[in-house]
Amino acid sequence: MAFLMSEFIGLGLAGAGVLSNALLRRQELQLQKQALENGLVLKADQLGRLGFNPNEVKNVIVGNSFSSNVRLSNMHNDASVVNAYNVYNPASNGIRKKIKSLNNSVKIYNTTGESSV
């Protein structure tokens, strides 16, 4: 009878260990899912602030085989969206213009000292 009791206790401890590992794994997966969802929400929020349609943003980020060629279309053109877009778009915020003017002001000299510009 004592032998059966020790087996029962051993099986109980082994089962508790497996259950504990399963719970830890489940908790880890929940945290990973939560982090992924937070990242997706943040990305969707950023694109939404730029004026993109939230449904299109969701389809692009999550993606599925039915909508592989979804294109983002700008929903509105108010001042806050335009200003936010200018921050992210180098073509419209003057950086390219500044680089071009810098390049135009820089003279390139060859080894004999003659300007090639």
UniProtKB/Swiss-Prot annotation:
Keywords for the protein's UniProt record, in alphabetical order: Capsid decoration protein, Capsid protein, Host cytoplasm, Virion
UniProt-annotated location(s): Virion; Host cytoplasm
One Pfam family it belongs to: VP2_lagovir
GO cellular component assignments: host cell cytoplasm; viral capsid, decoration
Role of this protein: Minor structural protein that forms a portal-like structure at a unique three-fold axis of symmetry, following binding to the host receptor. The channel formed by VP2 may allow the delivery of the viral genome through the host endosomal membrane.
Family to which this protein belongs: Belongs to the lagovirus VP2 protein family.
Subunit: Homooligomer. The portal-like structure consists in 12 copies of VP2. Interacts with capsid protein VP1.
Domain notes: The N-terminus domain points away from the virion surface.
Name of this chain's protein: Minor capsid protein VP2
Source organism per UniProt: Rabbit hemorrhagic disease virus (strain V-351) (Ra/LV/RHDV/V351/1991/CK)
